Amino acid sequence: MKSQLNILLGGLGLFALQGCKTPQAEQAQQPNVIYVFPDQFRNQAMEFWGQEGFREKVNFRNDPVHTPRLNDFARESLVLTSAMSNCPLSSPHRGSLLTGMYPNKSGIPLNCNSNRPISSLREDVDCVSDVFSNAGYDCAYFGKLHADFPTPNDPQRPGKYVEDRIPAWDAYTPKDRRHGFNYWYAYGTFDEHKNPHYWDTDGKRHDPREWSPLHESGKVISYLKNEGNVRDPKKPFFIMVGMNPPHSPYRSLDDCMEQDFNLYKDQPLDSLLIRPNADSKMAKAESVRYYFASVTGVDRAFGQILDALKELGLDKNTIVVFSSDHGETMCSQHTDDPKNSPFAESMNVPFLVRFPDKIQPRLDDLMLSSPDIMPTLLGLAGLSDSIPANVQGHNYAPLFFNEKADIVRPAGALYIQNVDGKKDEDGKVRSYFPSSRGFKSARYTLALYV
């Protein structure tokens, strides 16, 4: 009788504990979020599109690339066939990604450099990282940001830009402009892929001699392992990883890993440039080998992060997204411009979301736009009520969780292209000119140029 009473009391005690969770215990149940977005990674450059279960669902051929980790990840994920970068250029997309706004509202209508003071991430809006931070998340940014107007604020050389070229493109982002990111290992923009540099949380510069995606994946893994006690293990985390490759340059082994280049070096160009609108005789055609090599290297770096999540037991409660800021035409469409155009090669970006036991692996033709990403990420993390009122994008988390959700799907996606407008006497751009506006549906693309 006494033992039965002890069991009963113990059970009641356990019930009471379960009914009175501490804030920390509740917080621990919030999902972690990792958003990985290499630069200039087109949607077609993923091997799984040519595999059974995928190829019959799309109307394009995949590039002949090797992406074994993305192949496996796709079979565990919701994969969008038609995610679009509305203004397919680095800084404007990043502005939309962070704010949930189109370029005319985010503060970033043009690529950021020191001649464009009108193009810089707004300080007076809550970015996705601000919302996560306010919800109790540890927030970390790794890699390329390219969302700030460069100023002469080099921590190592006060009063100077972080680079000597004019205009300056690279930038140091001080703590008061990091929008809730409490851990920082990032830079503005810099295109020496095996000679990258980063500023850490305290402004110290690091110059590793390592291919940047692999270096960044290593730093992310150190963060996940909490080496150096860099995060609060009681808090969920929100991580953004802005890898630079396969962004140009893509012309030598200085730009990619040799082991990846060897997969493509002996392939005839017309066996690599297989899109029906591609021209293997263009001067740029040789670049495809280095571009695809970088794609394969990014795949490997991404896989290392996935392996660490599993090893640490974090994979089940972590939302992982793989995407890009825009695509790459790579000898298609008779243009030398790799981006900033209404073509599918430029606008159509990867968008894969894995959330084990919460999101069913499948394909969906949702035409997700750049401003939709921020509110959708917040919705996936259970923070729909915290989406700022000024966000222009839509929260498609209900559709991600349930493909039959009663939600209006977009009929298409806007296309936006801006160029420099009026300049002052010092050559600074003081306005932008809307050079093209358009609309892309599942079947048609309309783009009007001025």
Q: What role is predicted for each listed range?
A:
Residues 2-5, 9-13, 20-449:
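Formylglycine-dependent sulfatase
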